[in-house]
Amino acid sequence: MEKALRLLPLASRLFSLLGMIVLIGLMPWLSGRDPALSLLRARSGEQEATPEALNAIRQQYGLDDGPLLLLGRWFHGVLRGDAGNSWISGRPVLEGMLQATGVSLTLMGYALAVAVVVAILLALPTLWRGLHGENRRPAGVLAVSLTALPEFLLAALLLIVGAVWLQWFPPYGWQSLQHAILPALALGLPAGGLLALLLNDGLAATFSERWLLTWNLAGIARRHCLLAVLRRTLPALLPQVGLVLIGLTGGAIAVEKVFAIPGLGRATLGAAIAQDLPALQCGILILLLLAFGTGFLMQGAHYLLLGRIAAALPNSTPPQHSSRASYIFAAVAALLLCLLVLSGIIRDPFSSLHIRLQPPSLDLPFGADATGRDILARVAYGALNTSLLALAVSFASLSLGIVFGLMPRLMCGIIELANATPPIVAGLLVTAVTGPSPFGAACAVMLVSWAPLSAHCASLLAEARTQPYIRMLPVLGIGRCRTLTHYLLPALWVPLLRHAMLRLPGIALALAALGFLGLGPQPPSAEWGLVLAEGMPYIERAPWGVLAPAVALVLLAVLAVTLANTAGNRRR
């Protein structure tokens, strides 16, 4: 029995990976639509779907053989390097996707270089203070500010400033190194801010350990102390660095769309919108392989550097600092968002009552969009719609997190799979099944948002079961079911609910990202990401159409990151 329990996590990981492969392979049938009809519509939206045309497509692609047989053929073809032919062009999809992957990997390499430089620069003050005996975890205002900017939003802002206003960089394309600067900054700056927060935490924790005080009293040179501190800190950060790199795979999709880069993310997004399922299958499979491969390499490097002593190393806690500034930032951001909603909620977000692309004025504070609609009203209603949808996703994620958190060994594979899947990649999967819609976007974000809550639930459950009064319950004749419902769950509910509410702004940002990419609500809906996307084609003539939703998203992002940072300090 004990041996079977030890093998349960491995079996969970294998079945989760197998389930993901089956899900990708069965995508043409999961939507409930006739695959032949989907293929016909992907090729030509005007051709009449006659029985003869549909039968010809079924015979050409062997669709009458059924999903299971075609799943086996698809998987066998993937193993042989044949991912099928595009439903639109009829050409093999693998070669084009591999070329696009090369472009995306190049962009991610540039972004990683930017992130490393930013993280080092922001961590230098912590290193300097620690080596000189002043050890405190910095507030990290600049790092928090960088982390607060989602990649798709930062890409739009950089496009406005660097390409439109200053005209220092080309706005679109991938022809030279100059074309890579703005996209690399859009991807690298948020990742660098997050790495800086992690590195500062790790360094502050290492500087608080007693062995370093002993070294200082022994007169060991500072350069040797510096090398020892880095050797102690960096290996423990590798798993977190892996999660940052996984995040780059999702962020690259939005950045490639903004700057028209012919990368894997843009190609996969185009396949999802066009319902070119063979290309979408291949793109998602490569994206997931990149994410899983990155996580596996980081975990492997962590084990190689530390070996069996990894589990024996103490988990140091960085010294706490006053988070008054974080509370002020969060309060100001929340207040400005409330003022924005209250000032625009009384306006009409759908009527085209104004001049097309009318500039801002006293009567029209944020101007009008390309169809003459009030942007302030659309941003205010977008805040309301996005927040309500994010609230529903948060409660659904909380419910799933509790259910799966009660079975940590059985669900460890699914939890790791959800953690390794960016929300945008999940959005591509769901869009292939349901099509672009608010419900599909909510499902996509929910499918990856429950995993941190589940891990938190499992940790709280293990801690609660060690309490003496819980261990005495079986002696008193109280069964497992009553123990769970009357003692364990009430102890878990409050901290998990607080955790879920702290994740609410981040979920809203994920929903906005899917809306920006065209995977969420469709026009004429008032949704933040959609409003931002509608203003992008007119960014040179009417930049206020992008700046207005961008400012609202920046406020939401600042609120999300400062709340998470403050909560992290409080838990320590």
Explain the meaning of each model-derived region:
Residues 17-66, 167-179, 342-370, 522:
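Hydrophobic alpha-helical transmembrane segments of membrane transport/permease proteins
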Residues 21-39, 240-269, 428-429, 433, ...:
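Non-cytoplasmic
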Residues 281-322, 408, 445-448, 502, ...:
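C-terminal transmembrane helix and the adjacent membrane-cytosol boundary/short C-terminal tail
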